[in-house]
Amino acid sequence: MGFSSSLSCSAMGALIVGCLLLQASNSNAQLRPDFYFRTCPPIFNIIGDTIVNELRTDPRIAASLLRLHFHDCFVRGCDASILLDNSTSFRTEKDAAPNKNSVRGFDVIDRMKAAIERACPRTVSCADIITIASQISVLLSGGPWWPVPLGRRDSVEAFFALANTALPSPFSTLTQLKTAFADVGLNRPSDLVALSGGHTFGKAQCQFVTPRLYNFNGTNRPDPSLNPTYLVELRRLCPQNGNGTVLVNFDSVTPTTFDRQYYTNLLNGKGLIQSDQVLFSTPGADTIPLVNQYSSNTFVFFGAFVDAMIRMGNLKPLTGTQGEIRQNCRVVNPRIRVVENDDGVVSSI
């Protein structure tokens, strides 16, 4: 079964959310949803079919592709710099602490890019492929659809140092989270709370959970905001001095579904990582009313999520003649230098 035939009735009903919010979003004027309408009509089906096929063997890939988009956009904007491998000119962002042995889905993006290049050579940017893949991943997992503004171009460099400092930590306090989001231009409480809802599916490694289970902030005690029953369960899954790479579901109730359960979990002290639970457990925080709203109304959460995703997708995009359209998402295009020999013959090298 292909991408178009896999859409459920509930997902199709969520189309309304995206349509209502497109006009309300402060979309970059140079980005538009119909950017590839004439130049690469099959782009959505190619990306969607790739994800559908991947989900058959890797139910986690949808959440991973959404996270890949987030980690790309927070470092100099949504420019696919995260996809670049090491070169003589720069160090890859994949080696940065928040990404190494954590961010995944690169091979899936490679397959999408290869298929798109066969259909529409040198037309679609890797940055737009990541953006579309994140949107379709949310939709296929039961979340909303929205018209994705397109027309980004790809960076010709990576930003290893910035990736080490710009991305929020799973151990962040609410103040630190707000600073990280504001630093990239996402300065509304709804940006933080709605985008954090991306943790309604997917998994995290035990190494990002265990400090709050056994020695929260150096107290030799667990995080007091943890639900006692949930604490017991997490200690079973992530024993002290155990394997830090073991994976735990962000949402133990509906682990592969994009829904509002994440916020219900926060109300019950069942946020998996510290940077999730602080949205509700920080006294007097302006994020608390939003957690309450999103936990009780799917339409409100989906609407806020779509709006925040469009805002994040519009962070400092490269457009027009900026950057390039990479032929291979892992490397910058080879530079062609035109030379003329003594006989006046022009060639490129």
Swiss-Prot record:
Reactions listed under catalytic activity: 2 a phenolic donor + H2O2 = 2 a phenolic radical donor + 2 H2O
Swiss-Prot/TrEMBL cofactor(s): heme b; Ca(2+)
Binding site for Ca(2+) 2: T200, D251, T254, D259
Residues annotated as catalytic: H71 (proton acceptor)
Residues bearing carbohydrate: N86, N217, N243
Keyword set includes Secreted: yes
Signal peptide limits: 1-29
Residue positions binding substrate: P168
Annotated binding of heme b, by residue: H199
Record keywords, A-Z: Calcium, Disulfide bond, Glycoprotein, Heme, Hydrogen peroxide, Iron, Metal-binding, Oxidoreductase, Peroxidase, Pyrrolidone carboxylic acid, Secreted, Signal, Vacuole
Broad class of the protein's primary localization: secreted
Pfam family, one: peroxidase
The protein's Enzyme Commission number: 1.11.1.7
Disulphide linkage map: C40-C120, C73-C78, C126-C329, C206-C238
Site keyed Transition state stabilizer: positions: R67
InterPro entries given in the database record: Haem_peroxidase, Haem_peroxidase_sf, Peroxidase_pln, Peroxidases_AS, Peroxidases_heam-ligand_BS, Secretory_peroxidase
Positions that bind Ca(2+) 1: D72, V75, G77, D79, S81
Location of the protein in the cell: Secreted; Vacuole
Cofactor: how and how many bound: Binds 1 heme b (iron(II)-protoporphyrin IX) group per subunit.
CDD domains according to UniProt: secretory_peroxidase (cd00693)
UniProt modified residues of type Pyrrolidone carboxylic acid: Q30
Tagged with keyword Glycoprotein: yes
Record-stated family: Belongs to the peroxidase family. Classical plant (class III) peroxidase subfamily.
Function summary: Removal of H(2)O(2), oxidation of toxic reductants, biosynthesis and degradation of lignin, suberization, auxin catabolism, response to environmental stresses such as wounding, pathogen attack and oxidative stress. These functions might be dependent on each isozyme/isoform in each plant tissue.
Miscellaneous comment: There are 73 peroxidase genes in A.thaliana.
Record's protein name: Peroxidase 23
UniProt source species: Arabidopsis thaliana (Mouse-ear cress)
